[in-house]
Amino acid sequence: MLSTRAASADASDAKDAGTANIPNKRAILSRRKLAEDLETLVAEHGTGDKLRPALIARLRGALNDGRAEVRARFEAKGSGEDCVRQNCYLADGVVRSLADLTVTHIFPTPNPTSGEVFDIVATGGYGRGELAPFSDIDLLFLLPYKRTPRVEQVVEYMLYILWDLGLKVGHAVRSVDDCIRQSKADVTIRTAILESRYLWGPRKLFHRLRRRFDREVVAGTGPEFVEAKLAERDNRHLKLGDSAYVLEPNLKDGKGGLRDLQTLFWIAKYLYRVEDVDDLVGKKVLLPEEAHGFAKAQNFLWTARCHLHYLTGRMEDRMTFDVQTSIGNRMGYTDHAGTKGVERFMKHYFLVAKDVGDLTRIFCAALEAESKRPPKFNILRLAALARRKDVDGFVVDGERLNVRSDRQFKDEPLDMIRLFHTAQQNDIDIHPNALRAITRSLSVVGPKLRADPEANRLFLEILTGRKDPEITLRRMNEAGVLARFIPDFGRVVAQMQYDMYHVYTVDEHTLFALGILHKIEMGELTDELPLSSEVIHKVVSRRALYVAVLLHDIAKGRGGDHSILGARVAEKLCPRLGLTAEETETVAWLVRWHLAMSYTAFKRDLEDDKTVRDFVSLVQSPERLRLLLVLTVADIRAVGPQRWNNWKATLLRELYNRSEEVMSGGLSVEGRGRRIQAAQAALRDELSDFDAADFERHLALGYPAYWLAFDAETLGRQARLVRGRLRDERPLTVNTRIDRGRAITEVTIFATDHHGLFSRLAGALAAAGADIVDARIFTMTNGMALDVFTVQDAAGGGAFESGDKLAKLSVMIEKVLSGQLKPLHDLTKRKAPHASRTRVFHVPPRVLIDNNASTTHTVIEVNGRDRPGLLYDLTRALTNLTLQISSAKISTYGEKAIDVFYVKDVFGLKVTHENKLAQIRERLLHALADPSA
């Protein structure tokens, strides 16, 4: 009877390993009380249809009360491991109580046959005794052999009740034979059985399954299982981004997350038959401090994940920007001087993710050392090394470089740097014993070793030798050596860049940049980066380039301009590393100005000669120009996926080529006329379908700057567009050209010029769903305007190329210019992508007005939060101030917009009056304000 089961329910729960240590469990759920209540419901309503709503109401009440108790305890004490085990205990009680009721009253069988007896088994995370607040529960209904009608009825009844309670239930109905057969064929099912946990029933089937599983599935298949789980892990990392340092990490499946710890435990359980990570200490697989680190990392990750579930009210594993601050606050990370609480929290998260990686690496290395996983090495090289007992003071042990003794680094601190150098030079991995010896001896990396010329020589060779520095420096960073040897670098380890533009932490970004630099030099990126791949082989100061990439962001997070502060770091550090005075000066200059080339290319008008001349006066030499180009490309490429595109490549190439021309004596005042003549001559060849009269008429339309703004092919397309419009006397002509190579669409508009045209066109393009990344504005001698916009798709970047969208774009322009549509009205309907996520970032509005950047224009730079219609609002403000916009540079960096306008006043002159400048600043700051805020 159900009442008999109820009498021992709470006592049996106390024996469960996963829930034995939960204090005052009955405050979460008393199974005895619940069972008595269900017995009462059966007495009141019978077992028919009337019972169902009352049963669901009582079970839902038990769930809600229990969840509230678990949440209250969690928010008071903040232990994620306690939370997931208490949630598991609650789910266990509900499932067991429902099973008791179903088999006792709904489908009773006084004397069930052997085929009607079954066990219920928890699998997945639920099987481990871990259940996050909104996670699924996975159940296995374990049968002796084939299904019977009664078993099917019980399973169906239970599942429908659980689903009606709002629980997400994954389930399987299998016999013991099914489980064994499918476990052999499918590693996912094998893993589910491996971490299964008895939940309800007579237990005989569960014990039979575990005995057969160990004997028939696990025995002799260790290497196969290890390979499968590690391949599964590697594929998961590739899918989510193969880095632990993405700024919106996945707490469960991301690199360094809970799944990596679980993978480690699955392998340990499979190979060593352990039930707890602490058991691996006795097996001499992990050291006590490593097992302690496992427990700390797991509790931190579970705590963050439980907070994430409670904050979002759903099963959610990605820690997006909009929840990071709240989770950090709940976990006790407050603002300190110069550092936000969220930055401290995320730094701790990244350090935990790094610890998880260290544990996984040590564990897997130990497996390989015991030949439980086939090694993957260069066999010929290892055979040669194996014949040498001593390799630069180390030994080859199990195809890895090992220390002679655990005290080697304490006796010879220099060997800690030499170990990585030797591993790099011989393309060999490092033995886990050596990694452990490093961990125990990190204190030897102090002032004395940092001042050792030989240590610095070895480090500089690691960084600037012909072997890939990223691999070795990553090993040094993961081991904690890099931060100790270069303390300034230690300050940026796990340092997040709290915005939506940067994807990685500062140290991870830096290591990626070094890897990209090496690939450029090795010719591995020639197709993608032809100019950099050519230029790098002309570089003389090769060592300075590699050191500059290592140091370019080393002063981030200190407050102040990280370029200036970083240059000071370089001036002190480079001599220590062994660089000459000339190399030190070059490195410091590159760090100081590492943003100058991208700033000029992306935010200044490259057709303005003064832009190029000012840049050249800063750079001064062809060698610095080459160094700065390669550094800039590696830096941008390493920011994150999608941050580099062909449009940026085009602008950098144009700036490089024009700067090189100036340095070789080009771009002189006298030469400008010759360049215009050359451009017009090239256009003449392009326009073979124009007769002489047509060609001369077209030449008369353009002012000098126009002929230098485009190549001959583009000028030819525009000439045909202009001629067609003038012949047909159309009020407006719109032409689009998709350039997939540069991932942009070029929109050319030829229309009657009037005040405010650019602003209205910007509004029309934004309303059509286009992001404007560049604009060139020309007034022709006949009073017509030829405006060329470079756009991308606002929905996902890339070229704006959908047929429907292009058609909408043309219609939108026509309607706006004809007055049929107001851009402002349409734009208010559009929301910025990721609006809720960007809201957490504060982007101070800023307006900078520069009358020195151009000889003919006032240059206005505007910074603020990006949103749909921002460019329209800004240009409308400038138009209302009777300013003429000659050109614009539009850039977005995550949530931040940086727009630059070249303007003149109504008389065609620079704006110099202080009152007018103040008015411009005030109006633009007003336009930067988000109307939806």
Swiss-Prot record:
InterPro entries: ACT-like_dom_sf, ACT_dom, HD/PDEase_dom, HD_domain, NT_sf, PII_UdlTrfase/GS_AdlTrfase, Polymerase_NTP_transf_dom, UTase/UR. This is Bifunctional uridylyltransferase/uridylyl-removing enzyme. Its EC number is 2.7.7.59, 3.1.4.-. Residues 391-745 are annotated as: Uridylyl-removing. Residues 506-628 form the HD domain. One of its GO terms (molecular function) is [protein-PII] uridylyltransferase activity. Residues 746-829, 859-933 form the ACT domain. Keywords: Hydrolase, Magnesium, Multifunctional enzyme, Nitrogen fixation, Nucleotidyltransferase, Repeat, Transferase. It catalyses: [protein-PII]-L-tyrosine + UTP = [protein-PII]-uridylyl-L-tyrosine + diphosphate; [protein-PII]-uridylyl-L-tyrosine + H2O = [protein-PII]-L-tyrosine + UMP + H(+). Has four distinct domains: an N-terminal nucleotidyltransferase (NT) domain responsible for UTase activity, a central HD domain that encodes UR activity, and two C-terminal ACT domains that seem to have a role in glutamine sensing. Belongs to the GlnD family. The keyword Lipoprotein does not apply. One of its GO terms (biological process) is nitrogen fixation. Uridylyltransferase (UTase) activity is inhibited by glutamine, while glutamine activates uridylyl-removing (UR) activity. Uridylylation process is dependent on ATP and 2-oxoglutarate, which are effector molecules that likely bind to PII proteins and control their activity. It comes from Azospirillum brasilense. It comes from the Bacteria. Modifies, by uridylylation and deuridylylation, the PII regulatory proteins GlnB and GlnZ, in response to the nitrogen status of the cell that GlnD senses through the glutamine level. Under low glutamine levels, catalyzes the conversion of the PII proteins and UTP to PII-UMP and PPi, while under higher glutamine levels, GlnD hydrolyzes PII-UMP to PII and UMP (deuridylylation). Thus, controls uridylylation state and activity of the PII proteins, and plays an important role in the regulation of nitrogen fixation and metabolism.
